[in-house]
Amino acid sequence: MIVIPRYSLIKEKASERLPELLENLNLKKPLVITGKNTKKYSKGFEFIYYDEIDIYNEEGFQKIGKEYDSIIGIGGGKPIDIGKIISNKSKKPFVSVPTTASNDGIASPIVSLTQPSYLAESPIAIVADIDIIRESPKKLLSAGMGDIVSNITAVLDWELGKIEMNEKYSDSSGIFSKTIAIELIDYVLNYDLKEYPKKLVKSLIGSGISIAIAHSSRPASGSEHLFSHALDNLKNKYELNINSLHGEQCGLGTIIISQMYYEEGRIDFKTVEKVKNSLKAVNAPVTGKKLGFDEDLLIEALSSAHKVRKRHTILRNGLSKEKAREILEKSEII
């Protein structure tokens, strides 16, 4: 069964309507999961800080399930991800209240806090207060663009999986996901960015819904995400103090992978340029140096990305370090 949000409030002062929304859903005793910087949006509700929760405490989840009738995640990626985990374990509906828009986790059923990520349930409702989101750090909002443009290469990888591996593919989910990315790219390239936060949130919610339709992360996560996870692995391996965000890394990965698809003749060069220019338009990094990684790390990440998880992509069985360098140079990442 496909579960997608029943309600989406995406407007200025939307958070003020949260009590009304809960009443409409007949939810009387929610538990809020939030952070210390976002607890101010939890007034009137019982709350727990996300970093005080043991996500492996099954007994605790059962207790929450008995005491509360719903879970609300208020904040960025971690409170919302942990809210999904608790919702999934306690069998209670989840309401997503993002305070920024850096990735499509605000609406998707994917829990990415743990690796490998896994499918839980989509939020029953999303309350996105544009006044709050507009005031969030610009770095987070530009990262959101990176997560959206990645739908372009993710869908190409999914189509490749269908062609080369006879993988199950959903036309509706694939088209929906790709269209969301194309529309946001066209917006940031052709209009002023006054409405960018609202457009971005709508796109991220749509991307999350495409995942729910497919019951897979395939429409929004391909080789560009493998590259991002490979960068994360290297940050851990070498204990690097690089403050790069998931969406920023995925945006850079999308530039790289779109170059590879251009060279295979599956997209035109105009698409590659649009991806890069849309990221530039929102001040997202488009080179490894701006992201904080040197050439050797980028080459190691790209040549090892195919090992991150078992998923057929244009990386296939992997790139040599020589080929990785060539692609990085052609895409002007290094």
From Swiss-Prot:
Pfam families: Fe-ADH_2. One of its GO terms (biological process) is phospholipid biosynthetic process. PANTHER family: GLYCEROL DEHYDROGENASE, GLYCEROL DEHYDROGENASE 1. It catalyses: sn-glycerol 1-phosphate + NAD(+) = dihydroxyacetone phosphate + NADH + H(+); sn-glycerol 1-phosphate + NADP(+) = dihydroxyacetone phosphate + NADPH + H(+). Catalyzes the NAD(P)H-dependent reduction of dihydroxyacetonephosphate (DHAP or glycerone phosphate) to glycerol 1-phosphate (G1P). The G1P thus generated is used as the glycerophosphate backbone of phospholipids in the cellular membranes of Archaea. It comes from Methanococcus vannielii (strain ATCC 35089 / DSM 1224 / JCM 13029 / OCM 148 / SB). One of its GO terms (molecular function) is glycerol-1-phosphate dehydrogenase (NAD+) activity. The gene is egsA. This is Glycerol-1-phosphate dehydrogenase [NAD(P)+]. Zn(2+) binds at D147, H225, H246. Its cofactor is Zn(2+). It comes from the Archaea. NAD(+) binds at G77, K78, P79, I80, D81, T99, T100, A101, S102, S108. Keywords: Cytoplasm, Lipid biosynthesis, Lipid metabolism, Metal-binding, NAD, NADP, Oxidoreductase, Phospholipid biosynthesis, Phospholipid metabolism, Zinc.
